[in-house]
Amino acid sequence: PGFEHYRFDLIYIDGDHTEEAVFNDGLSAFMVCRVGGYILFDDYEWREETKRGIDRFISVHANQINIIKKGYQVLVQKTSN
């Protein structure tokens, strides 16, 4: 059992900092984030690998999110499925 039947207003991502893990965490979060909800990525400016994973997520979902803040943390709002 997982979270696939739930929808969340805010999801905070601060786990494995490899590019692939951050990207996959973003994809998983996007699936369970409600439209209008937020995904917050930590450590964007900490390691290049982490930054690449977050940038990949943003690129894939560019038409479905708004970037609210981009600094040490990145906050995006989901605008559509």
Locations of regions flagged by a protein language model:
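Switch II (G3) loop of P-loop NTPases
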Residues: 16
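C-terminal substrate-binding/active-site "lid" region of AdoMet-derived donor-dependent transferases
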Residues: 19-81
